[in-house]
Amino acid sequence: MTTRTSLTIVLAAGEGTRMRSSLPKVLHPVAGRPLLAHVLAAAPHGEGDKLAVVIGPDHQAVADEARRIRPDAQIYVQTERLGTAHAVLAAKQAVAGGADDLLIAFGDTPLISAETFARLREPLRNGGALVVLGFRAVDPTGYGRLVVEDDRLAAIREQADASPDELKITLCNAGVMAIDGRIALDVLGAIGNANKKGEYYLTDAVGIVRERGLVAGVIETDEDEVRGINTKAQLAEAEAVMQARLRQAAMAAGVTLISPETIHLAADTTFGRDVTIEPFVVIGPGVSIGDGAVIHSFSHIVDTSLGKNTSIGPYARLRPGTSLGDGAKIGNFVETKAAQIDAGAKVNHLTYIGDAHIGPGANIGAGTITCNYDGFNKHKTEIGAGAFVGSNSSLVAPVRIGAGAYIGSGSVITRNVPDDALAVERNDQSVREGWATRFREAKLRAKKPKAG
């Protein structure tokens, strides 16, 4: 069977005024990934699949994000907002380039799946001219109704134009559409603007196709999958749906989530086998978790690689650039950033490790700080294999602690320490016998009321 080519046009020109944000609507995140990125990741991206993204004026950030996800993306600007068909024809050059299937999607529908795009194309393979994605709405008020006759799409009826019987229809238009690429440019060009708003509506393509004796059809999907995001409340709703999906997928893959509804995952989180995550854990973008890892409650992890059988938290914060080797441990109230912590190393309590490399089997005592920033630049701390850093130590970078070296508790280390050496930097202890008794007696005498 010959593989069909495709062109997906993603409409992302909306201002998103109801978001009340300076950030373009399609760049707001769901599960740590911009809305647009979810759509582009789901769109066909094989050898014969092309992508065009239609953006608004002054939306260079949207173009940059599109090319970050899909370097092959063609960018087109819709200078005027004159309806959905007008937006599609902003990419007229791409449509004219030819493809077997033209897919039209929206940059603010992050829950759409690759499987749905594939199902949308199937009727075109079987001779259909146009396919609309529909959903059964719990409350269809405000949606265009899909009027189906003899298993074919007869019309898309907007609510204001619907008859009483048509208003009872719960099958609604999701806006996503597929058109036979051979007729796409002709059909789109035939759409007029003879309506109250003077705009060009993509939904008119259904009538044009039927007038030409061609077949229009409907593919149904779940209502959640085609949620459009126009407000912060809708953004939160989409986040909830996405999180439920991600948790379910993680558990299906063998991850133990002790209290799933309290755990936040990112769209790109990857898991090994037998991973356990306790309640109230937040995992941001860029995290990979190895076999047997345990993440304890109230930990926050971003852009981090965890090796096999690692242990994190509770109350740990792992910031970007952190990597842990197999069996390494990060304990409670520990923060790391740009830190490589090798196999078997332990950082158990109340510690900051930034811009550092900790060798295998090293032990970092409670209250240790790598002093990595001098007010202008960051500097690196190197701690060798098997080194032992005593509690309440400050390691002033750049500095190297040799393999097997010991650092005495309370030390401020400013110079390199050789392998297997002991470094202690603190004043000699002074003991004054009886001082506490004399101090208390003097204070009590001072508190006696004066004779008067």
Curated annotation (Swiss-Prot):
The gene is glmU. Its cofactor is Mg(2+). In the N-terminal section; belongs to the N-acetylglucosamine-1-phosphate uridyltransferase family. In the C-terminal section; belongs to the transferase hexapeptide repeat family. It comes from the Bacteria. It is found in: Cytoplasm. It comes from Rhodopseudomonas palustris (strain HaA2). Residues 254-452 are annotated as: N-acetyltransferase. It is an enzyme of class 2 (transferase). This is Bifunctional protein GlmU. GO terms for cellular component: cytoplasm; membrane. Residues 233-253 are annotated as: Linker. Its EC number is 2.7.7.23, 2.3.1.157. SUPFAM superfamilies: Nucleotide-diphospho-sugar transferases, Trimeric LpxA-like enzymes. GO terms for molecular function: glucosamine-1-phosphate N-acetyltransferase activity; magnesium ion binding; UDP-N-acetylglucosamine diphosphorylase activity.
